[in-house]
Amino acid sequence: MGDRVILHSDINCCYASIEHLHHPELAGKPLAVGGDPEARHGIVLTADYIAKKYGVQTGMALWQAKQVCPDITFVSPRMDLYLRFSRMAHEIYAEYTDKQEPYGIDECWLDVTGSSSLKGDGLLIAQEISKRMKSELGITVSVGVSFNKIFAKLGSDYKKPDAITTMYKSEFKQKAWALPVSDLLYVGRSTNQKLAKFGIRTIGDLARADEGMLNSHLGKMGSILWSFANGYDESPVKLENTHAPIKSVGNSTTTPKDLVCDEDVKIVLYILAESVAARLRENGFRCRVVEISVRDNELFSFTRQKKIDHATNITGEIAAYAYQIFKENYNWSKPIRSIGVRGADLVTDNYWEQIDLFSSVEKREKQMKMDSAVDEIRRRFGFYSIQRGLMYRDRILSAVNAKEEHTVHPHGYFG
């Protein structure tokens, strides 16, 4: 069997590039998306390449960005607009393969192994996608072409903007091994610091390191990263549309900034619970188990679940259970990088269960009616037409429509 052909497409400075299309008067001028420009608070979600040359970085406070780039223009995020462009990009991708795995709004893996006989080899497909993104959407992409997902993403990061980089088996040692180990997917700041203590500064250093030593200091992440560096990633690109029976419904997200307190977590859990509950209702299911997954900023992760009293697809109930599970199981030893909510042990809407005389049937019926009304308002007028008051406490964390974006980040590497 021959090598797989995997692409990773990354929309360059996604939010900023789309805003430039809608603000032609800002052509050639530095621009950043994020926060509340009028109130001058919040952080930079993305900056264009002009602003980056001045030192503006994602996650930087707006006031800091203004200091390093006095002429910068800030615009508030418009997630509905960015999601529309993301969907249009995926429509282009779908003409080459149905094996698409989104990684956020702006990135996507494509398995085009079965498309080469009709569309040409991976490099040709990447060139065609790049050309079409420019001509049809007005934005540029960087595309990595490789035999696995890890090196395909490394290829898309290798050169920006508007570039195509191959990372074939015959060349990845020459191209990848000289790069800083921090360029490898899932090597965060803390892991990078640990590796540096052992003299591991490049991907090549990591590939040549003793796997047992890495395991002793990093746990199973040591073996995972060692295999990535050596090109042994065999993780599949997941089909975009799967018609297998639904056994659970979940969403997870890597947040735009680390979560550092209970309030941060509550906001994100409610966003994810809204998505899970809405998708349960759409498919005619309720869940009898609520599960959360948490990963800290050192990539240590855990999963906990709770059997609940009544099968539910009520947003508030799922969110409350998720938050209760979190409070009972996390001690805030480290900030949180990503979090997920899942409804499992599903039953259909017509499932009959014993009514507890002490439970508030009337209250639950009101909550169900409220959820149905919210579903209808959002269907007619858009996701952001109605929001919970909680979401206004942090507009950066609450700026994600988890249901529509449906960017369940790939956690399969971590079990």
Q: What are the functions of these language-model segments?
A:
Residues 147-150, 230-231, 286-297, 336-347, ...:
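A glycine-rich phosphate-binding loop feature that marks nucleotide/adenosyl-phosphate handling sites
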Residues 1-227, 237-240, 278, 364-415:
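Gly/Gly-Pro- and Ser/Thr-rich, intrinsically disordered tail segments characteristic of DNA damage-repair
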Residues 108-114, 303-306, 353-359:
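Short, hydrophobic beta-strand segments
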Residues 14, 37-40, 297-300, 346-349:
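Short, charged/polar surface micro-motifs in flexible loops or helix N-caps
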Residues 323-380:
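C-terminal hydrophobic structural anchor segments
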Residues 8, 183, 191-336:
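DNA-contacting surface of Y-family translesion DNA polymerases
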